[in-house]
Design a protein with these regions (language model features):
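Electropositive, intrinsically flexible nucleic-acid-contacting patches
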Residues: 1-235
């Protein structure tokens, strides 16, 4: 059975104008230390920076933006800080295996984290026909940085780009499809959770169907009882 250990990233976070992809990775790094009962975490800047693969200064700047956009609360705690996470509805899951990968750079991880919610997920793959410019507008990362990440991910065999027969409405050129092998770079958890969610939904629907059948049977029994009572009165 594949590991379901993961960290959750709120879906709406990257849609906030002042938030940039590196902030998402910092959020994930802090959340990795979360106490699930209290929804608080106590990592030092050094620990957060180590998980991210960046400097403590970068971490501090990201924390300021996360606090300003109300996704994170920070309080002084002893010699360090205590972090509180705000409630959210939809989320993307990121495996600890993904966060710990040494063959992905800080920039590549933030890119993959930011764009995951815009992918079509199926068969351990994540697909999109968004161009670098279109994705740039969605995740607040420059097209040149996205293209650089794509080239690196192709070299690592984590990404394949193939031509499609779909035309871009603006340029008239044929679109390319980017296919990310999520399982290969540690994100199989997405599909484990997806299948788990599907199983829960199927059980829920099955229970609802059984309940409906039970209700129908009870109504029929009551009708028979009523009819029997009326027959006895006639006799």
């Amino acid at each position: 059975m594949k590991d379901k250990k993961h960290v959750q990233l709120p879906n709406g976070l990257i849609k906030t104008d002042s938030i940039v992809p590196k902030d998402l990775l910092v959020y994930l790094a802090i959340k990795r230390f979360e106490d699930w009962e209290t929804h608080t975490a106590y990592p030092s800047l050094k620990e957060i920076a180590k998980v991210c693969g960046c400097t403590e200064k970068t971490v501090s700047e990201s924390i300021k933006r996360l606090v300003a956009t109300d996704y994170l609360e920070v309080e002084k705690y002893k010699k360090g800080k205590k972090y509180f996470f705000k409630k959210y509805k939809g989320f993307e899951a990121f495996a600890l295996e993904f966060l710990d990968r040494n063959d992905l750079s800080f920039t590549e991880k933030q890119y993959l984290a930011a764009q995951q919610q815009f992918l079509i997920l199926e068969n351990n793959l994540g697909k999109t026909t968004y161009s670098s410019y279109e994705m740039s507008n969605k995740i607040n990362m420059s097209p040149s940085t996205i293209q650089r990440c794509d080239r690196s991910l192709i070299a690592k065999e984590y990404l394949t780009i193939i031509p499609t027969k779909v035309k871009d409405e603006e340029t008239g050129l044929l679109k390319n499809e980017k296919i990310f092998n999520l399982e290969k770079f540690g994100q199989a958890v997405v599909f484990v959770l997806k299948n788990h969610e599907k199983s829960i939904q199927e059980l829920k629907e099955e229970n609802e169907s059984l309940k409906k059948n039970q209700d129908i049977i009870l109504r029929e029994i009551n009708k028979l009882k009523t009819a029997r009572g009326e027959a006895e009165l006639i006799l």
